[in-house]
């Protein structure tokens, strides 16, 4: 993924000499990322889009390693796109440099884009009358409301590519989970997880 990321991130880091640089990277399961990317680019099919690349070989860890090597003084924060609804406030706090318990405005604006209008209203009303005591409780409530009120068109990804079957998608997902584990162990990388 992103073969010139090392050069481009290094150039970005040089824009403000002496400034502390941080990079934030959302990763996504290649089994859902590729179909979405192909739909956006109107690619003819996976064989044209991927060429000789084996879909099982697609990993995010080399990208993160390249960014770290090109910018050894910079920290890199990574999260899985699939987890975004549960960890959105943490992402915002990390990106803005706020302390972990800082209450930010608009932390549920993202959820409004993936939930029904009735669902987001109910969730906000619930949080108003039952403020969560910690992040774990907040995540459980968000997960419960998403289970009931998610806008399926916004969160479901249809994987319908020629030559891709359930076994391939499952194998890609397992490889992605192993890749996440490798990223989590990298020095200078903060992986935000639920």
What does each model-found stretch correspond to?
Residues 1-194:
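Anion-recognition interface
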């Amino acid at each position: 993924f992103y073969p010139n990321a090392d050069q481009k991130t290094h150039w970005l880091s040089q824009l403000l000499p002496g400034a502390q640089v941080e990079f934030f990277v959302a990763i996504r399961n290649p089994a859902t990322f590729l179909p979405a990317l192909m739909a956006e680019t109107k690619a003819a099919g996976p064989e044209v889009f991927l060429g000789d690349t084996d879909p099982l070989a697609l990993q995010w860890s080399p990208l993160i390693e390249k960014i770290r090597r090109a910018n050894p003084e910079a920290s890199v924060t990574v999260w899985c796109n699939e987890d975004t609804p549960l960890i959105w406030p943490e992402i915002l706090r990390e990106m803005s440099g706020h302390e972990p318990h800082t209450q930010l405005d608009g932390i549920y604006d993202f959820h409004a884009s993936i939930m029904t209008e009735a669902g987001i209203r109910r969730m906000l009303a619930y949080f108003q009358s039952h403020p969560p005591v910690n992040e774990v409780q907040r995540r459980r409530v968000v997960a419960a409301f998403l289970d009931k009120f998610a806008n399926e068109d916004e969160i479901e990804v249809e994987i319908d590519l020629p030559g891709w079957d359930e076994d391939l998608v499952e194998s890609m997902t397992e490889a992605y989970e192993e890749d996440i584990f490798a990223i989590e162990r990298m020095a200078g990388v903060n992986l935000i997880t639920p």
